[in-house]
């Protein structure tokens, strides 16, 4: 009976869907989390501590609550943002469709990018500033410093955050259940 379930085409399609969504979510979350970590740690942006706290909010809420909120905002026929664009700018159809692979992945990115953000922030804050100073004294430019020093030192944190996101996204059932069922997108 177990083998019969594993060999059904629906099970294989659910596995493919899970891998597609997890891959898209991992790539998106890694890019967003790394960018915001760099922004918070390497710039003189105001309200850095507020941003750090704000990025931790998704950990305090169940993911399906955020999914329902995004569904209310971006639903193709009744979402507030789509209705705003249709009524204000006269679009003939919805601007955003949250019931696609990209929509599901975008919602998961909003929820999961703090995994990478926290890891990369820690790595960037612990980086020895004398490495950058030595490279500057040696005549290296910002691009060279980033490519030869910063990225190699931060890469383990980026990869560990990406691995966490990939595993979590593969096991994350709620978002796909709320958004994907209407389009026949199921996951394992």
Regions found by a protein language model. Name each.
Residues 41, 137-138:
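Membrane-helix boundary and inter-helical linker elements of multi-pass secondary transporters
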Residues 131:
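Helix-turn-helix DNA-binding elements, focusing on the entry/boundary residues of the two helices
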Residues 138-139, 152:
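Glycine/proline-centered hinge or cleavage motifs at structural transition points of membrane proteins
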Residues 46, 140-141:
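Short coil/turn motifs that cap or connect alpha-helices
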Residues 1, 7-125, 153-174, 178:
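Membrane-water interface segments at the C-terminal ends of transmembrane alpha-helices
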Residues 1-4, 183-188:
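Short hydrophobic, aromatic-rich alpha-helical segments embedded in or entering the lipid bilayer
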């Amino acid at each position: 009976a177990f083998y019969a379930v594993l060999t059904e085409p629906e099970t294989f399609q659910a596995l493919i869907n899970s891998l597609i969504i997890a891959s898209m979510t991992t790539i998106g979350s890694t890019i967003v989390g790394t960018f915001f970590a760099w922004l918070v740690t390497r710039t003189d942006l105001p309200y850095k501590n507020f941003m750090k706290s704000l990025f931790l909010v998704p950990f305090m809420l169940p993911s399906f609550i955020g999914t329902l909120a995004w569904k209310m905002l971006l639903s193709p026929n009744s979402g507030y943002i789509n209705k705003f664009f249709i009524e204000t700018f006269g679009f003939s159809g919805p601007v955003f469709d949250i019931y696609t692979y990209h929509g599901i992945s975008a919602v998961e990115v909003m929820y999961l990018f703090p995994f990478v953000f926290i890891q990369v922030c820690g790595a960037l804050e612990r980086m020895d500033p004398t490495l950058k100073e030595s490279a500057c004294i040696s005549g290296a430019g910002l691009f060279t410093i980033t490519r030869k020093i910063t990225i190699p030192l931060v890469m383990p944190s980026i990869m560990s955050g990406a691995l966490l996101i990939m595993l979590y996204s593969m096991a994350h059932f709620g978002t796909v259940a709320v958004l994907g069922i209407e389009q026949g997108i199921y996951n394992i």
